[in-house]
Regions:
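Glycine-rich phosphate/pyrophosphate-binding beta-alpha loops
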Residues: 138-140
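C-terminal edge-of-domain segments
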Residues: 143-159
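RNase III-family endoribonuclease catalytic core
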Residues: 2-115, 122-123
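A glycine- and small-aliphatic-rich helix-loop capping segment at beta-alpha/alpha-beta transitions
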Residues: 20, 118, 146-150
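Pyridoxal 5′-phosphate
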Residues: 132-136
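Short acidic capping loops at alpha-helix termini that bridge into adjacent secondary structure
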Residues: 126-129
Length: 159
C-alpha cells in the first residue's frame, strides 16, 4: 500500500531597492528585489518548506541556516535539489506542487513557464505536476506598498 503526505510552505522576504529579484529561478526586471542570505527566492523557499514538512524533515532554516556562509548568495534551485535528495533518502517522491506568489509588481504570469521549467528540472518532476499562480494584495499592507513578497506552497509526496 502506498503512503501519501501533504506539506505546506510559506516564505516572506523584504524588498529592497537595487537588489536582484529572483522568483522560481527566474531573474525579474524590477526596481527592487528580495533581500536575504541566499538568493532570497521566496517561491523556492516556500516549496522547499512544503516538501520538508511533508516528509517530517523540519524546515529550510534547519537545513540551510542563514548563519552558515556556505549558503550565502546560493541559488535556491540548488537548495531545492538538496531537499529532493533528502526526500529520496527517506523513500519519498514528489506527486505535485501547487504554489501562490503574492506581490504587487512585477507581473509574474509571463514568467510562469520558465519558473516551471526550472522547478521541474531541480525537483526531477514533470512541469505538468507544478502549478504556479500569482495575485496582488490589492495595494493593502506591506505587500501592497511593495515592501515585501510572500509565497505559499502545498505539495503531495508519496512512497
Amino acid at each position: 500500500m502506498s503512503k501519501i503526505r501533504v506539506g505546506f510552505g510559506f516564505d516572506v522576504h523584504q524588498l529592497k531597492e537595487n537588489h536582484p529579484f529572483i522568483v522560481g529561478g527566474v531573474h525579474l526586471e524590477h526596481h527592487s528585489g528580495a533581500f536575504g542570505h541566499s538568493d532570497a527566492d521566496v517561491l523556492l523557499h516556500a516549496i522547499c518548506d512544503a516538501l520538508l514538512g511533508a516528509a517530517n524533515l523540519r524546515d529550510i532554516g534547519y537545513h540551510f541556516s542563514n548563519t552558515d556562509e556556505r549558503w550565502r548568495g546560493i541559488s535556491s534551485l540548488i537548495l531545492l535539489e538538496h531537499v529532493v535528495v533528502l526526500l529520496a533518502e527517506k523513500g519519498w517522491s514528489i506527486g505535485n506542487i501547487d504554489a501562490m506568489i503574492c506581490l504587487e509588481a512585477p507581473k509574474i504570469n509571463p514568467h510562469v513557464p520558465a519558473m516551471k521549467i526550472n522547478i521541474a528540472k531541480a525537483a526531477g518532476i514533470s512541469e505538468d505536476d507544478i502549478s504556479i499562480k500569482a495575485t496582488t494584495n490589492e495595494q493593502l499592507g506591506f505587500i501592497g506598498r511593495e515592501e515585501g513578497v510572500v509565497a505559499y506552497a502545498v505539495c503531495l509526496i508519496e512512497k
